[in-house]
Amino acid sequence: MDFLQSIILGIIQGITEFLPISSSAHLILMPILTGWDDQGVGFDLAVHVGTLLAVILYFRKDVSELFIDGLRSIAARQHVGQSRLGWAVVVGTIPACIAGILLLDYIDTALRAVGVIITTTVVFAVLLAAGDRFARGSRTLQDIGFKDAIIVGLAQAVALIPGTSRSGATITAGLFLGLNRESASKFSFFMAIPITAAAALVKLLTIASESIAVDWLGFLVGGIVSFLTAITAIHFFLKWLNAFGMWPYVIYRLVLAVVLYLLFF
């Protein structure tokens, strides 16, 4: 992988990971559109670590409170501070972990197809639009219970299908549960932390077990670029959220689906 390729793929991962437009779809499509070799599991690990560090740093105060209050709640045997929300994040992560363990091989083979990506891109554009237009309410992060977390977690499990978008699916689920835009989005960002860490761990174990060659410079560049672009994307996503809602991403998904259809069918 050359230097320019590492930069471009790092930018794509950083921008798309936390926007409801599907990072996996873009990373799968780039080699198809450009003729580049697949970036491989090592590069995937690097950019996942970059985006993971970005979301932890951006929400460092919230993450610290969730983690510390979660530990305090264990000692106190009751909810303390933000511990209820923290445990909701943990509970919400379980469905995607189970689905990943059971279905990852099938997802990485049978579902990594342009037709699948086009279908999920359109379907979840419509659902995102419906959630933003009709379903969002006034519930906040403090109103999220374990039932809500499981429902959002199931949406995150569905998002393992390429083209769906993890953030898009979880934000949509949050909106349909009556969360306001900011709360649905922030809960989605919080849930990204454990699932991204789990994905990075799986990729690391794969590299170790299969003795995959490591392009340290390319991985470092991709990781740094994905970190910088991800933290920028999070900032502007939240800044523009109330002004524009989800419609820019709905429109982008529909345009992307049309372009892909014209290119491949």
Curated annotation (Swiss-Prot):
<keyword id="KW-0997">Cell inner membrane</keyword>
<keyword id="KW-0472">Membrane</keyword>
<dbReference type="GO" id="GO:0050380">
    <property type="term" value="F:undecaprenyl-diphosphatase activity"/>
</dbReference>
<feature type="transmembrane region" description="Helical">
    <location>
        <begin position="217"/>
        <end position="237"/>
    </location>
</feature>
<keyword id="KW-0812">Transmembrane</keyword>
<feature type="transmembrane region" description="Helical">
    <location>
        <begin position="1"/>
        <end position="21"/>
    </location>
</feature>
<feature type="transmembrane region" description="Helical">
    <location>
        <begin position="87"/>
        <end position="107"/>
    </location>
</feature>
<keyword id="KW-0046">Antibiotic resistance</keyword>
<dbReference type="GO" id="GO:0005886">
    <property type="term" value="C:plasma membrane"/>
</dbReference>
<dbReference type="Pfam" id="PF02673">
    <property type="entry name" value="BacA"/>
</dbReference>
<keyword id="KW-1133">Transmembrane helix</keyword>
<keyword id="KW-0961">Cell wall biogenesis/degradation</keyword>
<feature type="transmembrane region" description="Helical">
    <location>
        <begin position="244"/>
        <end position="264"/>
    </location>
</feature>
<protein>
    <recommendedName>
        <fullName>Undecaprenyl-diphosphatase</fullName>
        <ecNumber>3.6.1.27</ecNumber>
    </recommendedName>
</protein>
<comment type="function">
    <text>Catalyzes the dephosphorylation of undecaprenyl diphosphate (UPP). Confers resistance to bacitracin.</text>
</comment>
<dbReference type="GO" id="GO:0008360">
    <property type="term" value="P:regulation of cell shape"/>
</dbReference>
<dbReference type="GO" id="GO:0071555">
    <property type="term" value="P:cell wall organization"/>
</dbReference>
<dbReference type="InterPro" id="IPR003824">
    <property type="entry name" value="UppP"/>
</dbReference>
<feature type="transmembrane region" description="Helical">
    <location>
        <begin position="39"/>
        <end position="59"/>
    </location>
</feature>
<comment type="similarity">
    <text>Belongs to the UppP family.</text>
</comment>
<keyword id="KW-0133">Cell shape</keyword>
<keyword id="KW-0378">Hydrolase</keyword>
<feature type="transmembrane region" description="Helical">
    <location>
        <begin position="187"/>
        <end position="207"/>
    </location>
</feature>
<feature type="transmembrane region" description="Helical">
    <location>
        <begin position="144"/>
        <end position="164"/>
    </location>
</feature>
<keyword id="KW-0573">Peptidoglycan synthesis</keyword>
<feature type="transmembrane region" description="Helical">
    <location>
        <begin position="110"/>
        <end position="130"/>
    </location>
</feature>
<dbReference type="GO" id="GO:0046677">
    <property type="term" value="P:response to antibiotic"/>
</dbReference>
<dbReference type="GO" id="GO:0009252">
    <property type="term" value="P:peptidoglycan biosynthetic process"/>
</dbReference>
<keyword id="KW-1003">Cell membrane</keyword>
